[in-house]
Amino acid sequence: MELNVTTLEGKAAGSVHLSDGIFGLEPRKDLIQRCVNWQLAKSQAGTHKTKGRAEIWRTGKKLFKQKGTGNARHGSARAPQFRGGGRAFGPVVRSHAHDLPKKVRALALRHALSAKAKDGGLIVIDSVELKEAKTKALMGHFSSLGLTSALIIDGAQVHAGFATAARNIPNIDVLPIQGINVYDILRRQKLVLTKAAVDALEARFK
């Protein structure tokens, strides 16, 4: 498929051929969902914790004698049924990460790229080099391109001036090509690729 290339200023800069094997697939929501769930589970802290009955600081003495009081048979005040007792089967610190095959992750990325291309949310620009690293000037460029929520992917090295100018703009994420991922693609309305990023993706999936 052919896609027009623009500059940061919004001017035409030719066109680029995009591989149908990367940008022309019929998106599969099940693959994309599996990859997003994998990413979010992997990033979850898992620091939730409550104390069990073995961790509560309280006397272990039997509350009252076994027989003759008419009360239920209790042994320890640390038991879960008492106020201040330990939690039964409470959450513990653990990792929520689970495995997802590399081939499934790679396929999900291609389907996420295809979904953006199909919805018209894919933009290709020639370069992100700026004459001066000014946030105000860059916001003007984004306004001319109609970018209010976008993920911008550059080549192996993001232009330093561009990264500096863009870091304080809300809803704008800038990543090198190594950092491209399904979740960040989906959480922004537009996906902006430089020609260097397109070449890197073509080389990666050829």
UniProtKB/Swiss-Prot annotation:
Annotated Gene3D superfamilies: 3.40.1370.10
RNA-binding recorded as keyword: yes
Listed GO biological process terms: translation
Gene Ontology CC annotation, any one: ribosome
Keyword field contains Kinase: no
Keyword field: Ribonucleoprotein, Ribosomal protein, RNA-binding, rRNA-binding
Pfam families: Ribosomal_L4
GO molecular function: rRNA binding; structural constituent of ribosome
Entry-linked InterPro entries: Ribosomal_uL4 (IPR002136), Ribosomal_uL4-like (IPR013005), Ribosomal_uL4_dom_sf (IPR023574)
Subunit structure: Part of the 50S ribosomal subunit.
Family: Belongs to the universal ribosomal protein uL4 family.
Protein task: One of the primary rRNA binding proteins, this protein initially binds near the 5'-end of the 23S rRNA. It is important during the early stages of 50S assembly. It makes multiple contacts with different domains of the 23S rRNA in the assembled 50S subunit and ribosome. Forms part of the polypeptide exit tunnel.
UniProt protein name: Large ribosomal subunit protein uL4
Organism whose genome encodes this protein: Nitrobacter winogradskyi (strain ATCC 25391 / DSM 10237 / CIP 104748 / NCIMB 11846 / Nb-255)
